[in-house]
Structure formats: C-alpha cells, structure tokens
Amino acid sequence: MKQKNNNGTILVVVMVLSWSRVVDLKSPSNTHTQDSVSVSLPGDIILGGLFPVHEKGEGAPCGPKVYNRGVQRLEAMLYAIDRVNNDPNILPGITIGVHILDTCSRDTYALNQSLQFVRASLNNLDTSGYECADGSSPQLRKNASSGPVFGVIGGSYSSVSLQVANLLRLFHIPQVSPASTAKTLSDKTRFDLFARTVPPDTFQSVALVDILKNFNWSYVSTIHSEGSYGEYGIEALHKEATERNVCIAVAEKVPSAADDKVFDSIISKLQKKPNARGVVLFTRAEDARRILQAAKRANLSQPFHWIASDGWGKQQKLLEGLEDIAEGAITVELQSEIIADFDRYMMQLTPETNQRNPWFAEYWEDTFNCVLTSLSVKPDTSNSANSTDNKIGVKAKTECDDSYRLSEKVGYEQESKTQFVVDAVYAFAYALHNLHNDRCNTQSDQTTETRKHLQSESVWYRKISTDTKSQACPDMANYDGKEFYNNYLLNVSFIDLAGSEVKFDRQGDGLARYDILNYQRQENSSGYQYKVIGKWFNGLQLNSETVVWNKETEQPTSACSLPCEVGMIKKQQGDTCCWICDSCESFEYVYDEFTCKDCGPGLWPYADKLSCYALDIQYMKWNSLFALIPMAIAIFGIALTSIVIVLFAKNHDTPLVRASGRELSYTLLFGILVCYCNTFALIAKPTIGSCVLQRFGIGVGFSIIYSALLTKTNRISRIFHSASKSAQRLKYISPQSQVVITTSLIAIQVLITMIWMVVEPPGTRFYYPDRREVILKCKIQDMSFLFSQLYNMILITICTIYAIKTRKIPENFNESKFIGFTMYTTCIIWLAFVPIYFGTGNSYEVQTTTLCISISLSASVALVCLYSPKVYILVFHPDKNVRKLTMNSTVYRRSAAAVAQGAPTSSGYSRTHAPGTSALTGGAVGTNASSSTLPTQNSPHLDEASAQTNVAHKTNGEFLPEVGERVEPICHIVNK
C-alpha cells in the first residue's frame, strides 16, 4: 500500500528506529527474546495483530504467565483469517496473511512491537521478514509475511490502543480494536484511523449507573485501574453518577505496579464507609482478582457487593479460589454470542497440530498443568522471561499426555471478546472486498512502465506482482489507508457468524449492547456460574428477582442515609448523600428533596406534601348562625319600622302625627330602615356592589338618623332658651328649614363617603387570619371604616350635649327626654361596639355579627324610644289623638303662670310676653288663665314648638287650642 506521508522528520525517526532494530537483531544478548516470537502467515494482503498473550513482567517486558484470553483472541484471528481465505465470495483469488505480535499487556512494549508494522510499510526497508538465528547476519525468516501491513487488529487494552493508534496514524495504517473501550479513542481529531467493534465506555458507565439506580443504591465506592481504560471509564461513571444523584463514598485507583499492601489499603478504606456496601470496579481483570484476594485476606464480616465492568466480565479463571468472595457479583459484559464453530476449532487443536502459534504450547501447559517434553512443539525461548524451564514448580508438574484435549471439563470456555475479534477481521475483509470490486474489476491491464513503476515504489506490489495467482491489482496497492478507512472500512455493514449486526458509527465505534451477569452458585452443585439477569441496549432491562446476593436473602441497601418519609426533606451532613430528615412546616410543601417552600396565601399542602391546593374561600353564609341572628333582628326591626311608617301614613293628618314634625319623623324612620337593611349588605357575599352598599349604607343610614335628631334637639334647645331672652321670632325653625338643615348634614356624610371611595376604591380582598383560612372581605381597612364614622360620632356627641341641655325643660315635654335617652343608649352601644369590633378581627363572623347587631340596636333604640309613645296613642288610645286634652301638671301650671307674669318658671325657664302672645310649655298649647290673661295669638318664639310635643297646634291659621280650653299633653297621658 502506497503511503502518502511526506513528513521527512517522521520518516527519518522511523528509519533510525528501524536500523537500530536491525542492529539489535545481530546482538547476541537479545537472541531468542520474546521480540523475535510472532505469528506470521504469508498472504497477498497482510493484517497485523496485537494481543496480550503474556502478563506484564517484573524487570522484563513480559511475565511468565500466559493469558487464556490473549491466546483465544489470537486463535480467533487465525480462525477468522482461515474462514475468509476459504470463502470464495470474499476476496476471491486474494489471500490474507497475518503478522501477530504479543503486547505482554504493556503499552510501551506494544508500541515497540508496532514498529515492525511501520518498518514494513517503508518503501525500501522491510526487515520484518528477517531473523538472526545464531547471531550472524539477518536471514529471511522462514514464515515471513514478505509484505507490508495493510491494517492492524488490536490492541486489547485501551492504553495499548492509544499508544499504537498514535503511531499507525502517521503512516495511514487503519486499526480496528476488538476490546479497547476508552472514550477518548472516539476523538477523530486524534485517532482518525482507529475503529472498534465494541462501544466506548461511555455507554458502559451509563449501564453501570442504571444498575445502581435499579437497586436504589445512592452511596457506593469505586475502584479503577491506572491507565486509559480505568481512568476514562471511571471519569464517565462519576459524571453520570453525579448527574443522577449517586454519591461516591470512596474512589480509589490501582497503580500499575501495585503490591498486596496497596490492595489491602484499598479494602481498609472501603471498610471505613460501612454504609457504602456497593463497590463498582472499573479495572482490568488482573486488578479485579487482586482486589478480591485482598478482600478475602481482610476476612470481612459484612461482604461487599461488587458491580464490575467488562474488565471482569464473565471470566471464570479470574475467580478461581475466590468464589465465596465474588458470589453475588453483578458484572457487565459486551453482548456476544458463542460461535459454536470456533469451539470446535479450539477443541481440535493440540501443540502438534498448531505449530503456527508459538505460544500455544505454553497455553497448553498452563491449561493442563503439565509439561511438554517434545522440543518440536515448544518455542525456542530459553532465555525469555516466560521460558517454561524458568517456571516455578516445573518439577512438580506431570508430563502432558497425548490424549489431552480442550473441553469444558478442563475449564475451557469461549472468551467473551472472541466474537469481536472475528468481527474485526471480517470488517477488514469486507472493506477490502469492496475496494477490490471498485478498483480492480473494471480496470484495464497495466502498462509495462506502470508495472515497473509500482514495483519500484511499492513493496506490497513487488510481492503480489510475483504471484501470478493473486487477483489483487496495483490500484489496491496504491490506495491510501486513510481513504480506505473513511470510504470503505467505516461503511461496512454485515451480519456476523453469531447472527449479530456489525457496523460502525462516524466515530468508528461499534453498537452498544451489554449483558448483565450475576455470579451465582449452581443449583445442586458446589460450582459457580455467571447467569444472565438482564440486558442493556439504549436502556436497562433487568430481572431483579433472579439476582442472588452474597449472604443476603433480600436486596441489600447501599445508602449513607435512609430515604426520608413523604413530606420530609434532607438536610445534608458531611457527604452529599448523607443527611438527616426534617419535616416541612404545616403550610409548606416539598419543593425538592432538600427544600421546603411556602404554599403561599390561600393555599395548603396535600397530605403527602408534594403539592398544594386552593383553600375554600370563606365568607358569611346565609344559613350560618352568625348570619341568622342579626338577620332575624333586622327583619324584626324592618317589620316594626314598616308598621310605624304605615301607622304614620294612615294618620298622616291627625294632630299627633302633625305635632311630631312629619318631615323629620319620616326622615328619621327612613334612616332607621336603612340601618336595618345594612345587615343584609354586610352578610351578603362580598362583591363590588355589596361593598359599595356597605360603605353608603352604614355611614349614610346613621347620618340620616342623627342629623334628624340633631335638628330636633337643636330646635328645642333654641326655642326654650330663646323664649326667656327674646320675644323675636326664631329663624330656621319651620319644617322646610328643618328639612334643609337635615339634608345638608346628611350631604356632608355622603361627600365624606364619596371621598373615601375615591381614596380607597371599593372592591374585595382576601384576608388571612391564619394560614388555613381565606376570608373574602370588602376592601375596607378597619381604621378607614372608623374614620368614615367619625362624622356620625360628632353628630351623636352634639345630640347628646343638646339632650343634656334640654333635660330640665317642663316635665310634660317628654320627647326631649326620650331623645336624651336615645343618645345615652347609643353612646353606650358605640362605646361597647368599638372594642368588640377591633378585638374580634381574627373572627370575621363574630366581627360582622357584632357590627350588624350594633347597627340594628342603634336603630332599634331610636325606633322604640322616639316612636313607641306615639304608636301607643295611635293604636291603643286613638281617642286621645285630639286637640282638647287636659293639662293637669302642677309644674306646667306654675310654668304657664310664671311665663304669663313674666317671672321665671320653676323649671328654670322664664318668659316675658309681648302684647298679643300666649305662653306654651311642655309642648302643649293652653293655660288655666282666663282669656283676658292669654291672648289668642301665639308667641312667635313658640310657633311650631308643639311639633315636638304630642299635642297638635297650628300657627298662622293652623290648629290651635281655644283660649281657656283645658288641654293635657299626650306624653303626660302616656306617662300616667
């Protein structure tokens, strides 16, 4: 394959390394080292292979132990190559060869080994087919592939693939890994020629966290291996765990050269967090085994529950002697199917029949714990670190029997990555097949000059041009590896030998499919097995009922703190997953697991505290006892008021009604009626309309009553006080004047109410006396309501003052006394109402009821005190409702005589009459004097004064008692 790398510096460096290696081959000290051991099969196209056949060595690149998985993966590549070469439908006429090397599970050594692939790709330098058998000059290796590497299968460890991919990309050599899962390998800006038949660890990390969440484990420890596999994998896992509220109690890293003390220290740290019973392992298989060994040495009283990545997977040998510690472990393994034909292939292999694999003899000895004596089947590695003769305890082993065969009885089990190795080989094969179809089937024969040019430029073409049977064409040899990777390799899609779909995404990653395994004791047996308990493909599907736990009959917990009960929140202490549970306030709901939030006014949390609901809005209901009582009083008051109005209307022109001052009497009755009706406005559901009625009704209703009473008391006071001082007729005491004065006083209250509505527009509001109550009320502040009644209080106060001033008027003038009694009682009611009203602010029902009853009582006092005497006469003594009534009061007679003589009266009132006047006291017209003593003309000061009494008279042509006529006041009669 023609390389297009023109970077002279890189070429010089590689040439130096290559020549140094040629020199090394001559060095006796390096003869027969592991470097010279490889699997090389000739072919038209050569694929390289990198597998961890041996473990790491101490003081040497490779250790003595042969890994079962490394040998199986190597054999899987050879098996797949055999199938492709024997398949007439794939690359017909073209043979694929191999050049497979051992990485010894070490990234630096793998990089050194990969230089063999690079040197073979240089135009005039191909030493990969040479060897120095006895320290002499290099000779062509017997099984040399005699050609450059077209692509590489491997490595297994992500750390190995990272090193190798950085080198191979410089020479445009594509690489497909069957096992490297580090996330960073998906970065096409760094690894633009790397692909893999397995998914990146990002998906595996998600699968592991899905398992933790499935068991409700929120507090776990993690252990990861040093290197790209463990470090990148655990980084992705920690990120996913943090996003999903899984906390890490202990996070430990296993160094590359860790000894038993390191592993014992890790277990000791895990024991310090006893609540974190779940332990996630993102380690290589050998590290996982040593962790289990350390756990066994610690003799744990409470076992850990292991959750492991595919580094552990479903390997049986990893757990030999540690089954009791590993029991119940849950592992993740790439979803793979058993290739039955590969098992048959492996089971028919023996050291005698598998001479092409130089490490198979070591694998055989390790599997059967025996020693091969036939040197013909053993690799010449007498000086290597893994030499059989150097193995400890070799003398104790028996000689290998010729009848030995691989089988399940001796512990053979198909390695989990076998399918992905085969898929990687087939991916190259199908991509090369498509390239061959595109470049070779339609091209014409090359000219002689072109063939000579390709022979001089391409080592690979020099090789295939000598093979007359090869169907490979020069264009395949000349095709750039990077273009091959992008145009062919990433675009392959096929169904593999296990029946699974194989394809790559644009990052070169395989499909993410995992099996979830549980390590369980076999039924009716002392053995153990991995049992599939679930799968992961874009999500977890797990049957928790089939999980077996270590020394547990029920699913264990792994949490720093137990979950909080419904309606409680977490208060963190120390680690983010450690908390104490605290209750929310009664009016709060659980906003999130750490926060309570106030539901807000008018809302209350449900019993589970997860959300809030709207509280029922409360207001006075018509059927409430608090409404029925004031309504009954109001209805009774309205009925009485209506009766009085009807009686007054029926007796409109009778002396009693006329003497009462009809205009002010009706005005006062209307005010009383308004006050009673206010009860219904106060009890009605608050709306803008009802709130307007409340404001107008209460203030204006009271102002109508007390404006009329003030006008009456003022008129009485003026008349009786002026009568003793002046004979001039008083102004503004006529009915019309009294109505105007009353209306003016009422208008002031109306104006105050209008201003109040402008300053504080009427409306409704919600009142919250406590968190569980929502009361709908009119938007009236208590103080503004009190201020709006200030004017009425002034009217009441003035009325009361006038009532006190007129308390000593003639005995028979009882209406003034009734007005006084009304005002005294009203003051008492209001003085009692104010503290009760403001003291019951938290109980809207009591407050509203108090207000309604207070208003009704004020109206009832006025109604009873002022109108009951008149109603009594109208109903029970209609015969008294006449002009001629007896005046038998001694006080009245003395007062009348004193007034007639111009002397002061016994009541404190004096009167000096002008010519043509007569004296009136007690609201009655008449005297015991003779007609010659009292003129028939009334005094102008007393005109209409009798309107305040229960005896009718008229001035200026209206009804008057005849001179000398005996008249008795009605109030006096009522009082008898």
From Swiss-Prot:
Transmembrane segment boundaries: 627-649, 664-684, 696-714, 739-759, 783-804, 818-840, 851-876
Parts of the chain on the Extracellular side: 26-626, 685-695, 760-782, 841-850
Major localization class: membrane
Disulphides: none
Keyword Transferase: no
Location of this chain's protein in the cell: Cell membrane
Entry GO terms, CC: G protein-coupled receptor homodimeric complex; membrane; membrane raft; plasma membrane
GO MF assignments: cholesterol binding; G protein-coupled receptor activity; glutamate binding; glutamate receptor activity; group II metabotropic glutamate receptor activity
Tissue expression summary: Expressed in the neurons of the larval CNS from the beginning of the first until the third instar. Expression in the third-instar larval CNS is restricted to a discrete number of somas and projections in the brain lobes and in the ventral ganglion. In the ventral nerve cord, expression is detected both in somas and projections. Expressed in the antennal lobes, the optic lobes, the central complex and the median bundle in the adult CNS.
Residues reported in the UniProt entry to bind L-glutamate: S158, A179, S180, T181, Y229, D310, K417
Keyword annotations: Cell membrane, G-protein coupled receptor, Glycoprotein, Membrane, Receptor, Signal, Transducer, Transmembrane, Transmembrane helix
Bilayer topology term: Multi-pass membrane protein
Cytoplasmic membrane side: 650-663, 715-738, 805-817, 877-976
Bias type Polar residues, positions: 927-946
Signal peptide: 1-25
Top-level taxon in the UniProt lineage: Eukaryota
Pfam families: 7tm_3, ANF_receptor
Region (Disordered): 920-946
Positions annotated with a glycan in the UniProt record: N112, N143, N216, N299, N386, N491, N524
Keyword Glycoprotein: yes
SUPFAM superfamilies (UniProt xref): Periplasmic binding protein-like I
Stored Gene3D superfamilies: 3.40.50.2300, GPCR, family 3, nine cysteines domain
Function: G-protein coupled receptor for glutamate. Ligand binding causes a conformation change that triggers signaling via guanine nucleotide-binding proteins (G proteins) and modulates the activity of down-stream effectors.
Family the UniProt entry places it in: Belongs to the G-protein coupled receptor 3 family.
Protein name: Metabotropic glutamate receptor
Organism field: Drosophila melanogaster (Fruit fly)
